[in-house]
């Protein structure tokens, strides 16, 4: 998860947006319920100070969507929500979840090759894989 936070900070920096620790809410787990609770805590602490939520897992984002709707937000007009993983359920939630889809099949193949390498006493290596943004209904540009 550390790399996802670093990626978030890098994206903010590239966009000229200052990083604000107060806008970070750590969920207790990766469950939908944890996403729901994390959004409630963030909204109570910082309501009105943000127009988007980026959750480090789709399950957390789905919980955020539910809590935001119950808090009176119009999605995505008032608030955009984006997840990370690309789970199938996100496409069927309302609004459908914009997400960062990971290449799971390729990841599995590479994990097998890396494990074989470790068994053959090869050096451990770190890989960063390209991901794909899947645009759906939970995100919009402000004013649209």
Question: Language-model segments: what does each one mean?
Answer:
Residues 1-144:
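Bacterial carbohydrate/catabolite-sensing allosteric modules
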